[in-house]
A protein has these predicted regions:
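N-terminal signal peptide c-region/cleavage motif recognized by signal peptidases
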Residues: 9-11
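Feature activates predominantly on carbohydrate-active enzymes
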Residues: 39, 44-47, 71-77, 81-201
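Short hydrophobic beta-strand segments
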Residues: 16-42, 57-63, 89
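Single, functionally critical "micro-switch" positions that shape active/binding sites
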Residues: 13-14, 92
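Sec-dependent signal peptide recognition
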Residues: 1-4
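Acidic helix-start/capping segments at beta-turn-to-alpha-helix junctions
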Residues: 56-68, 120-123
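Residues at alpha-helix termini
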Residues: 54-56, 177
Length: 201
């Protein structure tokens, strides 16, 4: 009984919630290719290399054809080749490739990719809204108006010399669900946020 209780409490302690819904298991040295290189595409490649477990190689493509242009820069397709031996995530924009990457990983994480589905993926997505915002009510002193979960994420006194790893985790979580904009300050923010120093931050 003592051992059981210890194990349960240890498991609870290990989960701090910071991974949010991005609790992917490690991948299996997945084969991921992208002809084009950019910071955004490197993130997509890294996510798949670290977490893709489907066993089928994945190719990332930025293409400028009629079908993809109709989906916009943030829309994408996820398709399995006719032979079933390759998955292609394609978009007319790099952002669309990243969103498609998270879509594929989400299907995997939620158990929606049995072998039969892997062989016949044919997904096409187009955002209904061009701007998808996460809105904050944070003040420059770290307090949050109507905030009930601690202090602000933003460490203004440390920026720009110290960039917290939490900012990357925050951006990753947003990208994984298609959020492409953020309001980082309260609507009644201090006018200091428009000063040169704060614009630099």
């Amino acid at each position: 009984l003592t051992f059981t209780l210890f194990f349960c409490f240890s498991s609870i302690w290990a989960e701090d919630g910071s991974a949010l819904w991005l609790r992917y298991a490690s991948g299996a040295k997945a084969e991921i290719t992208s002809k084009k290189q950019s910071p955004t595409l490197r993130i997509a490649v890294s996510e798949l290399q670290n977490f893709w477990q489907g066993g089928i190689p994945v190719t990332l493509e930025v293409r400028n054809n009629k079908e993809l242009r109709a989906l916009g820069n943030e829309g994408y397709t996820i398709q399995t080749s006719k032979g079933g031996n390759q998955i292609t995530i394609a978009s007319s924009g790099e952002q669309g490739v990243l969103y498609g990457t998270y879509h594929l990983l989400r299907l995997q994480a939620t158990g929606q990719l049995p072998e039969s589905a892997l062989q016949s993926l044919n997904i096409s997505e187009r955002p209904d809204y061009r701007i998808r915002i996460l809105n904050h009510w944070d003040n420059l002193d770290g307090t949050i108006e109507r905030g009930y979960a601690g202090h602000s994420l933003w460490k203004w006194d440390e920026l720009p010399s110290v960039v917290s790893p939490r900012y990357e985790a925050y951006a990753r979580a947003n990208a994984s669900i298609g959020i492409n904009a953020t309001v980082i300050n309260n609507v009644n923010a201090s006018p200091k946020i428009l000063s040169n120093d704060y614009l630099q931050k």
